[in-house]
Amino acid sequence: MAKKSKIAKNEQRKEVVAHHAARRAELKRTAVAVTAGEEERAAARLALQRLPRDASPTRVRNRDAADGRPRGTLRKFGLSRIRVREMAHAGELPGVTKSSW
């Protein structure tokens, strides 16, 4: 079980990313645009650097929805590999069966 503070911090980061997503995308588009002038591109890069650090989607961590485990998370289920295995064995994941051959 992850610390509650780590889970809460990650949720806060998700909100910050969502809040700044449109502005960030616009600035990135301007910063790499060939048609924009060099000064305009430099200003866009500077404005991009001024955004909060947590506005970058890279800072959001995929965590287990059940207990917040940060590693080994399967995106398809939103759960950690350990939790997926436990739930699959218990028959709690529809359509998932233990393979045997």
From Swiss-Prot:
Region annotation Disordered: where it falls in the sequence: 1-21, 49-73
Gene Ontology CC: small ribosomal subunit
GO aspect biological process, one term: translation
Pfam families assigned to the protein according to its UniProt record, in alphabetical order: Ribosomal_S14 (PF00253)
Record field: transmembrane: none
Keyword entries, A-Z: Ribonucleoprotein, Ribosomal protein, RNA-binding, rRNA-binding
Highest taxon listed in the record's lineage: Bacteria
GO molecular function: rRNA binding; structural constituent of ribosome
InterPro entries linked: Ribosomal_uS14 (IPR001209), Ribosomal_uS14_bac/plastid (IPR023036)
Database matches in Gene3D superfamilies: 1.10.287.1480
Start-end of Basic and acidic residues biased regions: 8-21, 61-70
Role, per record: Binds 16S rRNA, required for the assembly of 30S particles and may also be responsible for determining the conformation of the 16S rRNA at the A site.
Subunit structure: Part of the 30S ribosomal subunit. Contacts proteins S3 and S10.
Family designation: Belongs to the universal ribosomal protein uS14 family.
Protein name according to UniProt: Small ribosomal subunit protein uS14A
Protein's organism: Kineococcus radiotolerans (strain ATCC BAA-149 / DSM 14245 / SRS30216)
